[in-house]
């Protein structure tokens, strides 16, 4: 399907609002669009459409806006479960997050949970909006809440002392009732987001990686592997490694084609066929990757943050225990893995999110923040992300 070309001279950043239920995430999202985008009312954002990511249904609202410096895509979720699913599946990638915390309540259970999730799924930076400051008349109390939020962030390895904390009222901004804590605070918040949340490196500037989807042998020319380039650029004549499942091997890309035309290079986002030198048709398989030599290693053991589907979502009807052996679907292939639950966790119920240890039966090209689906016989029963690699 032809889409209109996305032309923009400003850097693009994906962000989202996180925080406890009813602390004002959606009101803040609405307030930002009021000054920086095409205004979206609370109800328009709150009625988030459902979408599917990795076989999981998630309600997510997307808005866009821009500051003089950047263009933003912003995601807001109606329910806590949607946040968990969103962050784990990466349905809406976050380059940074705005943590919304009510000054009247201080940090609450989901404040903590969203910060932990942000840490586990590798959200690089957080900016804090202390909302509802008009409900707190004591300046000392306000300082205490700010301190509490900073300490909470530090306890999850975010730089709590350096993170910008902006105090204001999303409602005051929406109702134009108090400019200082309304409009001024929203403008101050976006200035902080502009300066504190780093611009992500564009996929095309990262080291080359292409998951292999298919392998063909073309008589007289050799072996062709096809797939969509995940990141970076591959030029004809460059050396690459084939990583995962089998021992890592090196080869040279002797041709790149797209839509049956020969190119001198393929780049992030392109669906290409790459002709590789000196590799037999059976020397390479789906589920391996082509990558820049030395950039990615194969691993079997990792810690993961996972969300397990409920029965209603098409998931399991029963809990699972340590030594559970489902398939882990990484990029283009399923690999069986053995799950070990954390100490003190007897079982995992459908609908839970959990940190687990996994050992795959064969090594897979893997990095932190790589996403996967958990499947049983081809049916998705969960989603996860590699939180850290063990070996």
Swiss-Prot record:
Catalyzed reactions per annotation: GTP + H2O = GDP + phosphate + H(+)
InterPro entries in the record: EF-Tu_GTP-bd, EF-Tu_GTPase, EFTu-like_2, EFTU_2, G_TR_CS, P-loop_NTPase, Small_GTP-bd, T_Tr_GTP-bd_dom
Residue span of region G3: 76-79
Enzymatic class: hydrolase
Region span, G4: 131-134
List of residues binding GTP: 19-26, 76-80, 131-134
A cellular-component GO term for this protein: cytosol
E.C. code: 3.6.5.3
Keyword Hydrolase: yes
Region feature G1, mapped onto this chain: 19-26
Pfam name, any one: GTP_EFTU
Highest taxon of source: Bacteria
Sequence segments annotated as region (G2): 55-59
Record key words, sorted: Cytoplasm, Elongation factor, GTP-binding, Hydrolase, Magnesium, Metal-binding, Nucleotide-binding, Protein biosynthesis
Residue span of region G5: 169-171
Chain positions recorded as Mg(2+) binding sites: 26
HAMAP family membership: EF_Tu_B
Similarity comment text for this entry: Belongs to the TRAFAC class translation factor GTPase superfamily. Classic translation factor GTPase family. EF-Tu/EF-1A subfamily.
PANTHER family to which the protein is assigned, alphabetical: ELONGATION FACTOR TU, MITOCHONDRIAL (PTHR43721:SF22), ELONGATION FACTOR TU-RELATED (PTHR43721)
Subunit structure: Monomer.
Name of the protein in question: Elongation factor Tu 1
Organism: Rhizobium etli (strain ATCC 51251 / DSM 11541 / JCM 21823 / NBRC 15573 / CFN 42)
């Amino acid at each position: 399907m032809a889409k209109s070309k996305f032309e923009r001279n400003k850097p693009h950043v994906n962000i989202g609002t996180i925080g406890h239920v009813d602390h004002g995430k959606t009101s803040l999202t609405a307030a930002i669009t009021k000054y920086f985008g095409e205004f979206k009312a609370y109800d328009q954002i709150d009625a988030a459409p459902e979408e599917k990511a990795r076989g999981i249904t998630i309600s997510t609202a997307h808005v866009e806006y821009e500051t003089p410096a950047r263009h933003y895509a912003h995601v807001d979720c109606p329910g806590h479960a949607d946040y968990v699913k969103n962050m784990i599946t990466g349905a809406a990638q976050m380059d940074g997050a705005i943590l919304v915390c009510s000054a009247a309540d201080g940090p609450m259970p989901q404040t903590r949970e969203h910060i932990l999730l942000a840490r586990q799924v590798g959200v690089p930076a957080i900016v804090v909006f202390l909302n509802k400051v008009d409900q707190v008349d004591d300046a000392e109390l306000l300082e205490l809440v700010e301190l509490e939020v900073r300490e909470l962030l530090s306890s999850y390895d975010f730089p709590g002392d350096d993170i910008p904390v902006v105090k204001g009222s999303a409602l005051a901004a929406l109702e134009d009732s108090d400019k200082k804590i309304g409009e001024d605070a929203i403008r101050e918040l976006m200035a902080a987001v502009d300066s504190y949340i780093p611009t992500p490196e564009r996929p095309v500037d990262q080291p080359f990686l292409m998951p292999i989807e298919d392998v063909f042998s073309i008589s007289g020319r050799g072996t062709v592997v096809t797939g969509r380039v995940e990141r970076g650029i591959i030029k004809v004549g460059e050396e690459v490694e084939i990583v995962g499942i089998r021992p890592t091997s090196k080869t040279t890309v002797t041709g790149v084609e797209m839509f049956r035309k020969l190119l001198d290079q393929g780049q992030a986002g392109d669906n290409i066929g790459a002709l590789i030198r000196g590799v037999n048709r059976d020397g390479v398989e789906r589920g391996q990757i082509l990558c820049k030599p030395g950039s990615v290693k194969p691993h079997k053991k990792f810690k993961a943050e996972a969300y397990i589907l409920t029965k209603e979502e098409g998931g399991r009807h029963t809990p699972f225990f340590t030594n559970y052996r489902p398939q882990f679907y990484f990029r283009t292939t399923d690999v069986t893995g053995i799950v070990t639950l954390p100490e003190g966790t007897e079982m995992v119920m459908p609908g839970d999110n959990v940190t687990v240890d996994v050992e795959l039966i064969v090594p897979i090209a893997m990095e932190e923040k790589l996403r996967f689906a958990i499947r049983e016989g081809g049916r998705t029963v969960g989603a996860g992300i590699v939180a850290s690699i063990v070996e």
